[in-house]
């Protein structure tokens, strides 16, 4: 148990309980081996142990074994991260839809409103449920579910989605700007 604390302007703090003082990961101007931005919106750890940070200036990926950093989707406001069962990462953005990246940060897929796959490009939450279905929600658009088994897309009349959290095999909790 480490506790990872992302802040909007102060980078990322790491609390290693009862062992060490809090470590702070922060953007260092001109240093590519630091966060790309201190405006951190989400943090995700892959099965391989790499840490992904969604920021206002793209994604920073920290290799925990080597300590090296990689930056992808530069200059795109990234809001939400969700690691899929195979280690790929879904990324919700503010204005650019949803990306699927492989574990090295390469773009595998890009979903947008213009392509008809989403009802908004302003995505606040991307989550995968226990069945492997992908749930996507954001500003001024419907809640979308991509069914893994059927390969189909369903939309629900739930708008202004702020957060999505799988509860069990049959339920997903959705928090919106107006209700829960």
Residues covered by each model-derived region:
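Carboxylate-rich, polar loop motifs that coordinate divalent cations or form catalytic acidic clusters
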Residues: 1-180
